[in-house]
């Protein structure tokens, strides 16, 4: 997709970092935005950055690991924007700890956000994106999806999983008018 003007993008983790910068960049190109983050204050800061962009912006405070919240957000996006052309599954967390040093709850937290959040975002938005006639699913991973690092076992595992999920999804959608990266 080369032209973002009047397209609609959903972005997870839009309250800071890469997600916030994606929102700013896409808005400058005339793309309407549906933004989500677990941090309402971060979302408000992103909206402030977009005030002069002249695009529609909706926000949803949610945890990407909450399947029902993701379903509601997808429906809300279509209700407010009419359609959706792309999703940036960007939300992620890290924990600098060895496997032995991390609790089960911390390990599950990383997996639920970094992997299942991507799956839920894809599953809920993909039918809507395909319906738009042209679209794209963009799953943000990291270099840790290519190489492992000590004290990042859980994070590495989720990023390798996202990479595998994305490559498989790309093959599944190869014959349809929907890109995956």
Per-range role (PLM):
Residues 122, 158:
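Active-site helix of classical SDR
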Residues 99-100, 147-153, 169:
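Active-site loop immediately N-terminal to the catalytic Tyr-X3-Lys motif
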Residues 98-99, 103-108:
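Substrate-binding pocket helix/loop in short-chain dehydrogenase/reductase
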Residues 2-33:
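Canonical Rossmann dinucleotide-binding motif of NAD(H)/NADP(H)-dependent dehydrogenases/reductases
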């Amino acid at each position: 997709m080369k032209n973002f003007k009047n397209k609609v993008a959903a972005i997870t983790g839009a309250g800071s970092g890469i997600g916030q910068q994606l929102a700013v960049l896409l808005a400058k190109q005339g793309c309407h935005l549906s933004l989500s983050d677990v941090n309402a204050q971060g979302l408000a800061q992103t909206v402030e950055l977009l005030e002069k962009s002249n695009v529609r912006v909706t926000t949803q405070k949610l945890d990407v690991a909450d399947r029902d919240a993701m379903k509601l957000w997808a429906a809300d996006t279509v209700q407010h924007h009419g359609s959706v052309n792309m999703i940036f599954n960007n939300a992620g967390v890290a924990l600098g700890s060895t496997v032995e040093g991390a609790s089960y709850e911390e390990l599950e937290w990383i997996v639920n956000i970094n992997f299942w959040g991507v799956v839920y975002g894809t599953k809920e938005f993909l039918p809507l994106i395909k319906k738009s006639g042209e679209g794209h699913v963009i799953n943000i991973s990291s270099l840790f999806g290519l190489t492992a690092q000590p004290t990042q076992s859980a994070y590495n595992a989720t990023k390798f999983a996202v990479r595998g999920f994305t490559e498989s999804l790309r093959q599944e959608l190869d014959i349809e008018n929907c890109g995956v990266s």
